[in-house]
Swiss-Prot record:
Main location: cytoplasm
Active-site residues, as the UniProt record annotates them: 25, 58
Modified residues (Pyruvic acid (Ser)): 25
Cofactor(s) the protein needs: pyruvate
Cellular component, GO annotation: cytosol
Pathway membership, UniProt: Cofactor biosynthesis; (R)-pantothenate biosynthesis; beta-alanine from L-aspartate: step 1/1
Taxon lineage: Bacteria, Pseudomonadati, Bacteroidota, Bacteroidia, Bacteroidales
Function (record text): Catalyzes the pyruvoyl-dependent decarboxylation of aspartate to produce beta-alanine.
Single biological process term from Gene Ontology: pantothenate biosynthetic process
NCBIfam families, sorted: panD (TIGR00223)
A Pfam short name: Asp_decarbox
Protein's recorded name: Aspartate 1-decarboxylase
Residue sites binding substrate per the record: 57, 73-75
Keyword Cytoplasm included in the entry's annotation: yes
Length: 117
């Protein structure tokens, strides 16, 4: 049996922009993507800690080292700059494999969205 489990999580990143006039997605600093084991085009689930919104979109790679977390298109209506969001991706895997699987979870610096070691 296959089940869906948490694969990666960027916990408590700060939204830097909301761009309504860009075709959908979330732009994420490439350093954060690497640290969280996420890739461009990957489907993500986003929870906004400030307003309780939850929604899905896909990733666009942002400039490395920029700290950028930008919600684009319709998703821009769901957040405000400086909101704190949790960005999660999931993977399908065999039930037995899932029992021992450990997701990648990162906690970026809340002021800069830089990767904290």
């Amino acid at each position: 049996m296959m089940i869906e489990v948490l694969k990666s999580k960027i916990h408590c990143a700060r939204v830097t922009e909301a761009n309504l006039n860009y075709m959908g997605s979330i732009t994420i600093d490439e350093n954060l993507l690497d640290a969280a084991n996420m890739i461009a085009g990957e489907k993500v689930y986003i929870a906004d800690n400030n307003n309780g919104e939850r929604f899905e979109t896909y990733i666009i790679k942002g400039e490395r080292g920029s700290g950028k977390i930008c919600l684009n298109g319709a998703a821009a209506r769901k957040v405000q700059p400086d909101d704190i969001v949790i960005i999660m991706s999931y993977a399908l895997m065999d039930f037995e494999e899932a029992k021992s699987f450990k997701p990648t979870v990162i906690f970026p610096d809340p002021a800069t969205n830089s990767v904290v070691k």
